[in-house]
Design a protein with these regions (language model features):
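NTP-dependent nucleotidyl-transfer catalytic core
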Residues: 24-49, 53-566
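Generic start-of-chain signal for non-secretory N-termini
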Residues: 1-22
Length: 566
């Protein structure tokens, strides 16, 4: 037996679609837009699609009537088709549905797709911090929602192990001649935290050397202050050895360049050095992600994309492509020509790519004159890999709004190289930054608030509140409840706001039971369960359907029934 509410909404969407010749999914999206309860339960802006909607409304009404849909009323008001349920008749049908074993289940998509969601993909140079929190929570929530809709979802983490930042961290460990995993065990420090400290000291020391070389005294003094702070955070008397070792390098830039080029070629000892360091950071990531109940199906190494020859194939494809060019003495793709030839001339492609008006893009460099590749080149290869590996219909990249330009360049490059399907089905799910009141985040200087620290802060505050409310609570029970509150608080805070709005995270506000917060949601859920438990088995035959006429009861009924459609 089908859910009568969901079935009715589907029938309404199908009827409107047939009458006005608009895709049913588009009709459904409009129906799901928020509407004021006093006007309707659902509303459709029919005036957007028809100049004279009055004649169609009667047809829609007759069509719904012929399908025996007597539980809805339809009105045309100011160009909107307002749909309101007869709550008594609806409630009667819903109680029959429940008595026959029906329940509230998420509506499955008519067309179930294979979808890749790549998210988090943090640089393996320090712990996951609040700058990553929104990405990881949005990515995991999106994956769960798509899965609930019946899509086959593949969750992937891209390990960016070929960037300059990773090389700087690796140079730090090379300088002190330590293996990060072994050292972290020996000194009992979480491996990602250890690598983050070594990276910050190495990066700041090298920048200070560069400032002195340029005789920039003011900058050198600022960096000296940063180094003093980092020295005070030394986990095991490592600072002096690391600082002096980096200062002793004849040419740090040449050292960095050599490590980077050799690692891209897969040569030893650079391969073992960077792989072992990166693995130690990933172990730290996994420990944090496990607390948040976030898992991945695949961990993809950027270096594997290079070593497997996928990047070379992309460059060879480009060289034999009419859009290949030279830009700043480097191999490149002529992005402006791709836009003129393939985007501006095709209305459908233009709508999907959605180029900002007046936005001009330069050619995209694929390989530097020294033979090394850029991360955008590797991202092009990785995008093709994600589609091919999973036979994906869609690939969603959850990446910050600051990466709009590179993400746009990748799609245009794919289009120019002949990967039209991939270009049009690669989706950039962007989001704005997370701020912490009074806190600056700067990974190169070791300035960040880690997810571990935030979870512990929330957990400790939750334990304090639990003990205030119930002084006799068992410590283990309090700890278990507080952990769930901490995870719920963080996850809810990261996804409740529109992704395109900057988010300021305030722990006290996030924990406030009087606010729209994770703990409030958890409390409401537990309270509702307790009420149902105390009530016992519900005798649906004894319910008077007319009682649903009450404004609040009606509102609760409609909102609850809308849940599977969201």
């Amino acid at each position: 037996m089908d859910n009568p509410f969901v079935k009715t909404v589907d029938t309404i969407a199908e009827t409107i679609s047939n009458e006005i010749k608009v895709n049913q999914e588009e009709v459904f999206r409009f129906l799901m837009e928020p509407v004021k309860e006093e006007y309707a339960d659902f509303s459709f802006p029919i005036k957007r699609f028809l100049n004279n909607p009055e004649s169609i409304v009667l047809k829609i009404y007759d069509s719904l009537k012929s399908k025996n849909l007597k539980i809805v009323n339809i009105e045309l008001i100011s160009g909107f088709l307002n749909i309101k349920f007869d709550e008594v008749k609806l409630f009667e049908k819903i109680t029959d549905y429940i008595k026959n074993g029906g329940g509230i289940k998420t509506k499955k998509s008519e067309k179930q797709l294979s979808i890749v969601v790549e998210h988090t993909s943090a640089n393996p140079i320090h712990p996951l911090h609040m700058g990553h929190a929104r990405n990881t929570c949005i990515g995991d929530t999106l994956s769960r929602l798509l899965n609930a809709r019946g899509h086959k979802v593949n969750r992937r983490f891209y390990i960016d192990d070929m960037g300059r930042q990773v090389v700087i961290a690796a140079l730090g460990f090379k300088t002190i001649n330590e293996n990060p995993m072994e050292l972290s065990k020996k000194i009992n420090v979480k491996p990602d935290k250890l690598v983050g400290w070594v990276y910050a000291v190495s990066s700041t020391t090298l920048d200070a050397l560069n400032a002195k070389k340029k005789n920039n005294i003011e900058e050198a003094e600022k960096l000296a202050t940063v180094l003093t702070r980092l020295k005070s955070q030394d986990p095991d008397n490592l600072f002096d050895n690391l600082f002096s070792g980096l200062n002793a390098l004849n040419d740090p830039e040449k050292e960095i360049s050599n490590i980077m080029i050799n690692y891209e070629k897969g040569l030893e000892p650079e391969k073992s050095l960077i792989r072992s360091m990166t693995m130690s950071v990933l172990n730290g990531f996994i420990e944090t992600l496990n607390r948040l109940d976030i898992n991945f199906d695949n961990w993809d190494w950027e270096s594997d994309i290079v070593w497997n020859g996928l990047v070379d194939r992309v460059i060879n494809l480009a060289k034999n492509n009419k859009y290949f060019t030279k830009f700043k003495d480097a191999d490149a793709l002529d992005i402006p020509s791709i836009i003129n030839d393939l985007v501006k001339e095709d209305q459908k492609i233009s709508k999907i790519i959605n180029l900002p008006k007046g936005f001009e893009l330069p050619p995209l460099i694929l390989r530097r004159s020294d033979g090394s590749t850029l991360y955008t080149t590797r991202d092009i290869a990785y995008s093709i890999y994600k589609f091919n590996e999973t036979n994906a219909d869609k690939v969603i990249n959850v990446i910050g709004a600051d990466q709009r330009l590179p993400q746009l360049q990748i799609r245009l490059a794919l289009l120019g190289l002949g990967f039209k399907k991939e270009a049009l089905n690669l989706i950039h799910y962007d989001y704005e930054i997370v701020r912490l009141p009074g806190k600056a985040m700067h990974g190169r200087r070791g300035e960040y608030v880690t997810l571990d620290e935030v979870l512990e802060d929330i957990k400790n505050k939750a334990i304090e509140e639990l003990k205030n409310r119930n002084p006799n609570i068992n410590n283990d029970v309090a700890n278990e409840i507080a952990e769930k509150i901490a995870v719920g608080t963080l996850r809810f805070s990261m996804i409740q706001l529109n992704a395109m709005k900057p988010l300021t995270f305030d722990i006290n506000k996030a924990l406030n039971l009087r606010e729209n917060s994770g703990p409030y949601l958890q409390y409401t859920y537990v309270r509702a369960l307790n009420i149902l438990e105390k009530h016992g088995k519900i005798n649906y035959d004894a319910i008077k359907n007319e009682t649903v006429n009450h404004k609040l009861r009606r509102s609760m009924l409609i909102k609850t029934l809308k849940f599977p459609l969201i």
